[in-house]
Amino acid sequence: EEEQRDLVTREHRFDIALLGRRLVAAMRWLDAEPGTRDLPIVLFGASTGAAAALRAAAERPEHVLTVVSRGGRPDLAGDALPAVRAPVLFVVGGQDHEVLRLNEEAARQLRVPHRLQVIPGATHLFEEPGTLERVADTVRDWCEQRLRAASPQDEQ
């Protein structure tokens, strides 16, 4: 029912507070499970989901290894941006001019390590040949770096 209503009204996809609360609830569930409680969490959000990921990261900073925003709307995270404590990767299509501008502005509000990676020739959904693969490679490399940095030296 909720999904059907959202198809018509789009009310939930832009309710960043609701989406953020859902992510926080999922992180709490992971923290309560013996098999997942000690695993690092990477929050990956696309479009409005990126804003929700940033809000959740700001609310539970001790639980988030990194945040990845793919074609995201981090501007919708509002006052949560300066409270984010995990490193952030922004991946934006080079032809997605407005979203690129919004990501540049959001990056300036962060007080943590971050990178803005522009994928040349890509539009908002990265539908052009090879662009989604470039996103995947970029995200993999970023997450591997974060995992290595977080691992105790004797495990590396």
Language-model regions, residue ranges each:
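Catalytic histidine neighborhood in serine/cysteine hydrolases
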Residues: Q109-L125
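Short beta-strand immediately N-terminal to the catalytic nucleophile in serine-hydrolase-like folds
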Residues: P40-G45, R70
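A conserved short beta-strand
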Residues: E62-P74
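Catalytic active-site module of serine/aspartate enzymes centered on a nucleophile-bearing elbow/loop
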Residues: A122-L125, G130-Q156
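Serine-hydrolase catalytic machinery in alpha/beta-hydrolase-like enzymes
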Residues: E1-L39, L125-G130, R134-V135
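Gly/Ala-rich beta-loop-alpha elbow adjacent to hydrolase catalytic centers
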Residues: F44-A53
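Conserved alpha/beta-hydrolase "acid-adjacent" motif
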Residues: H97-L102
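Short beta-strand/loop motif that positions the catalytic acidic residue
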Residues: V84, F90-V92
